[in-house]
């Protein structure tokens, strides 16, 4: 079975929807629970972090509120310091072997990266306009390079 899930729910103003998240977490009882990047839309990340802890999340997947996590290294540092050992801050979005050095000064425990590359779609569905002209696939070379870069941190 599954050992973990990634969940998220926001209110119209961007705050975490505590009621919905509580209900989802109850359904995921016994699993490792990660708060997804809806966290990046919250107007007060410090308060949202405390809410995530109170709700029982074990980690927060976040770009630090930026399009790419490496562009928000200082925000991530602040979140990691606030979190301490209570919850893991897992940077994600724009993580690659080339961008990892921007986060090297952080006490990271985990990162999230797609390690993907664009691949053209050549089937009839795409040709007829029923799908995107390309898809993203995991690139083994990028995965290996990221693992090597992480080992050097």
What residue spans do the PLM features occupy?
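Short charge-dense sequence patches
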Residues: 1-4, 24-31, 52-55, 97-100
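Glycine-rich phosphate-binding active-site loops on the catalytic face of alpha/beta enzymes
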Residues: 1-12, 57-72, 106-134
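Catalytic beta/alpha-barrel core
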Residues: 3-17, 32-43, 49-50, 58-70, ...
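Alpha-helix-loop-beta-strand connector modules within alpha/beta enzyme cores
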Residues: 13-38, 71-97, 132-153
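Catalytic cores of alpha/beta
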Residues: 19, 40-55, 78-91, 95-113
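Hydrophobic/basic alpha-helical segments enriched in Actinobacteria
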Residues: 29, 50, 54, 65-66, ...
């Amino acid at each position: 079975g599954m050992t973990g899930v990634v969940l998220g729910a926001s209110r119209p103003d961007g705050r975490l929807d505590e009621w919905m998240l509580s209900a989802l977490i109850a359904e995921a009882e016994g699993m490792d629970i990660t708060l997804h990047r809806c966290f990046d839309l919250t107007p007060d990340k410090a308060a949202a972090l405390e809410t995530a802890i109170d709700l029982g999340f074990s980690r927060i997947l976040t770009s630090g509120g930026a399009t790419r996590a490496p562009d928000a290294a200082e925000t991530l540092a602040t979140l990691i310091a606030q979190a301490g050992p209570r919850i893991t801050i897992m940077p994600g979005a724009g993580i690659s072997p080339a961008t990892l050095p921007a986060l090297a000064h952080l006490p990271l425990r985990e990162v999230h990266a797609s390690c993907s590359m664009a691949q053209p779609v050549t089937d009839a569905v795409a040709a007829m306009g029923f799908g995107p002209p390309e898809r993203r696939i995991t690139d083994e070379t990028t995965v290996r390079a990221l693992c090597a870069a992480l080992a050097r941190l």
